[in-house]
Amino acid sequence: MRPASALLLVLLLAPAVTAQRPAPAAAAADSWRQFRGTPSLTGVSASTPPSSLKVLWTYDLGDVIDSSAAIADGVVFVGGGNGDLVALDLASGKLRWKYTTGNLIGESSPAVGTDAVYIGDLGGIFHAVNVRDGSRLWTFRTGSEIKSSPVIVNDIVLVGSYDAHLYGLDAKTGALRWKVMTNGMVHATPAVQNGVAFIAGCDSILRAIRVTDGKEVYQIDSGAYTGASPLIDNNRAYFGTFNNEVLAFDLERRRRLWRYAPEDRQFPFYSSAALANGRVVLGGRDKYIHALDMATGKPAWTFATRARVDSSPVIAGGRVYVGSSDGRLYVLDMESGKKIAEFDAGAGLTASPAIASGRVVIGSQDGILYALG
């Protein structure tokens, strides 16, 4: 190739190279320390479970499981509807310890730090529990029920409450560092990127809040009541709303990038999204799992289940793992959306999968926690 031709080829290829976006953050292969796996709530695991899932063990919590499991250091942590937070051996399912909150536990899912595991209950109490023996370290009382899941950012733990506040607490002592009042219940889990927490709220506002001091940096009017948690990746936010739509926002320009709203099926999106390979994947109450182009919002594929999908998908090993209220955990090919396998739990799956060390852990509406691999 002549020098001039080679230079021209380099110039033509350069924009394509620089336009490539870094891959979304993924949870480590051996851990899933919080709801959605990472503080930015990407829903991606570096682990690769087998495509054909078999039951390795089960554990009966005795009540409905809406809480999604966390996995750290070979231990599974999950909350049950009866108010118990349990720690189980990942390999065997054997009970390590049980902590009783004294209230019911709903959708709040545990977050695991170095010394403590954190969870909220429906009585509005936020708990820090010794990760090794299940003893109480401290509690913090909010003004209403907690369905939001905690996120640990250095020495601060974040959690939302139905009292309309997002709280920043000292992770070691439970002391209040700050709180931010919104105009509605804080149901969703905050997503964190570069020291800023983002909450998509029941007041139709996407708020950016500095983690160190709780200062609101800016807000964007999403125009819709939101129960799903936002996914943040490379200064973009993705989330579904109760206005039967999925939205993407450019956080630098603070404007909407695209809106996806199926014309033939008007149902809310309660599931939180996962992102990999240029696609945003989430479940809908229209009984479908949707995969959208991250740049345009155009559908890449949909997959029909037999009931609404409130469970949030996890992407691992080129596959999508997601539960449905029809009682099945589906394994789908990430590129095509074709079903690879399914596991029938026999009861609705509204909790989300946790994936680590080649295992998939999910709880069902009849109180059974499954470890599959």
Residue ranges and their predicted role:
Residues 80-90:
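Beta-propeller domains
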Residues 89-93, 130-134, 170-174, 210-214, ...:
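Short loop/turn segments that connect beta-strands within beta-propeller blades
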Residues 21, 27-29, 39, 57-70, ...:
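Extracytoplasmic beta-rich repeat domains
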Residues 44-62:
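A short helix->beta-strand "capping" segment at the edge of beta-propeller domains
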Residues 6-16:
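Bacterial N-terminal signal peptides
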Residues 1-4:
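Positively charged n-region of N-terminal signal peptides that target proteins for export
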